[in-house]
Design a protein with these regions (language model features):
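ER/secretory pathway lumenal C-terminal domains and tails of membrane proteins involved
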Residues: 1-5, 22-224
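Phosphate- and divalent-cation-binding pockets in alpha/beta enzyme and binding domains
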Residues: 17-21
Length: 224
């Protein structure tokens, strides 16, 4: 049910291995790139994701190898130094920098990378998301100016950092989906912008307040 050339985030083996089998053995939907979040903390796996595979382009990741190799940015602390939202792209550039002012000295063991705000956003080019089919014309009035999330907890893993970077770097070029049935923490606040398409949630620039029922996220594309 994924749109062509999509990126699909999965988590566990049960989510991922059947999809790998379908692509590798059956040759089915090789244009879709499967990104397993439980592996995305490994530098070797990030290397693979950045390369073209089958019929899918490499995953858009702005970090270079020296910025994500093993032992570097394995976790990033969240420090609420400013309240106003910052663009996710700007924050990723901040985290990737080695300038002294981008490091925190609040912890024992030396300077660590940090994110200076909980409030992040991805700007939305309304014309672009209509032209490339992210949003259907009949929903054009629902498009938000920016997709906003608020980070939870005190830190991010490398895998979570890569998810944010992929969404920021992609900039609405390729369809991005999260698998259904993942823990809500894995959605990182994007569930308010989910659109159910078959058995996957597509990230769209339309905000839908979640219902009280657990795992009841976003809106539904009934045309799939």
């Amino acid at each position: 049910s994924c749109a062509p050339n999509a990126i699909l985030f999965t988590y566990g083996d049960n989510d991922t291995f059947p999809l790998w089998y379908a692509q590798e053995v059956e040759g089915f939907r090789r244009d879709v790139r499967i990104v397993n979040l439980s592996l995305l903390a490994g530098d070797w796996y990030i290397d693979q994701m950045k390369r073209k595979a089958y019929e899918s382009d490499g995953v858009p990741i702005s970090f270079t190898k020296d910025q994500y190799h093993a032992g570097v940015r394995d976790f990033v602390t969240i420090e609420e130094r400013v309240q106003q939202p910052f663009s996710m792209k700007e924050v990723m550039e901040f985290v990737a920098s080695d300038r002294p002012e981008t490091k925190s000295n609040r912890y024992q063991g030396g300077a660590v990378d940090f994110i200076p705000t909980r409030n992040l956003y991805i700007p939305v080019d309304k014309e672009k998301v209509l032209v490339n089919g992210t949003v259907q014309p009949e929903d054009s009035a629902l498009i938000v100016d920016r997709v906003e999330i608020q980070l939870k907890g005190n830190s991010l893993t490398k895998s979570q950092l890569m998810v944010l970077d992929i969404l920021a770097t992609n900039n609405w070029e390729r369809p991005i989906y999260f698998g259904v049935g993942m823990g809500q923490d894995s959605y990182m606040g994007f569930d308010k912008y989910f659109q159910l398409e078959g058995a996957a949630y597509r990230v769209v620039p339309i905000k839908t307040e979640n219902n009280a029922a657990y795992y009841d996220f976003g809106r539904i594309n009934t045309e799939i």
